Amino acid sequence: MTRIAVCLLFAALAGCKDQRSEPAPPARYEAVKAPAASASRWCDNSFVGAAPRLTLPPLAAPAAGRGQASLPAGKRVWLNLWATWCQPCLREMPLLLKWQTDLRKDGVEVEVLLLSLDEDGPVLEKFLAEHKEFASAKIGRAASQRDYEQWVSSYVKDPGTPIPLHLLASADGNLRCVRGGSLREGDYPAAKAALR
């Protein structure tokens, strides 16, 4: 019996832990902060301070019923270089036009201009007639491939840089960002930062 009592006593003592309470977990766990949207990482070329002035290349006559695209004075500009034969360009255009609205809602007034590199004016006109979603978009067309290449070489090292190509300018008309390649939904914060 004594043996049983001793075993029970040891079992009871072993089950008793130090009654000191463990520190409570922190009320708020530290989270890893997401990196801030970085225009300099998003842009292939970004400019701070002295920057080239954004201009348009010589433009072909506008499509029927459209005014000539021009750079608005005193407004931020997003110039998108595209073509009707460029599938990545066509996929990103609805997103770009949506972002124009979103940017305005976020207090970033920007004018989006679509500069077509289609050499055949009737092809562009047919495309615009079939795609009513671009009815309100400001669209211009480069007058010639040679004019375009001379003009774009002011902003990119290789005039053969593939499209889509995006040139973002501040309200003073100076280039802030050059970005090659398609837009993705997750690019919005960096694009917004590039326009600020």
Describe the function of each predicted region.
Residues 128-163:
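Short, internal strand/loop/helix patches
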Residues 2-59, 177, 196:
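N-terminal targeting signals for export/organelle localization
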Residues 75-77, 82-85, 162:
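Short pre-active-site segment immediately N-terminal to redox-active cysteine/selenocysteine motifs
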Residues 83-88, 117-122, 144-146, 174, ...:
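Solvent-exposed loop/turn segments at secondary-structure junctions
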Residues 81-98:
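Conserved redox-active cysteine motifs that mediate thiol-disulfide chemistry
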Residues 46-77, 101-102:
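A short beta-strand-turn-helix
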Residues 161-196:
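Thiol-/selenol-based redox modules, centered on thioredoxin-like
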Residues 108-123, 135-146:
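Thiol-based oxidoreductase modules, predominantly thioredoxin-like and allied folds used
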